[in-house]
Amino acid sequence: REIDTKKLYYGFPVILIGYKDPKWRYNVTTSSSSYSLGDMITVGIRTNSNAEKNIKEYKEFTVNIPCQEILNKVEIAGFHPGQNKIGMADITYDPGKYVDAPILDECILSIECKVEHIVEYGGYTNFVASIKRRVVEESVIDEEGKLKGVEFNPIYFVGDEYQRVYRYFNDESRNLGDNIGCSAEDDGPTCG
């Protein structure tokens, strides 16, 4: 049946966007609006926010994927606009290697991004960026440096305009294509 809501979040990863902030050196904000294809990533944040203004100005940022153990820091980053949220949440970081934005130490994945295109729509600004570097916590990669998807446990954002909640993965996982006897290869899917 049709639902009447102005917002619908159907399970998006919560991200911490790190950016250069001349008042505080670096700062962070939360978002659940992102996607990545190849070496491109797109993130969306509210137009005229402190983060949006600074990312527009400096054309670079980081995407940091937190886990549930630091949810209190995630919420501080989301509820205190224009303040020194890195200091308030006691977030530790290192500057990026290719961008002047923070790589957050307690996040399981961090991505350094350079803005390529900016699209404003409906009170939100979408930053389309090229990925310059990916940094992953040791516990989620194997000996060959490949991501262990089974160990990856981000926070998901689900809800509508009336209620929003955080969700987490359970321990169940399956390889892509297992349900139909296929596998995903670099050059495309194979079956049989």
Pin down the residues of each PLM region.
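Basic, polyanion-binding surface patches
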Residues: 1-192
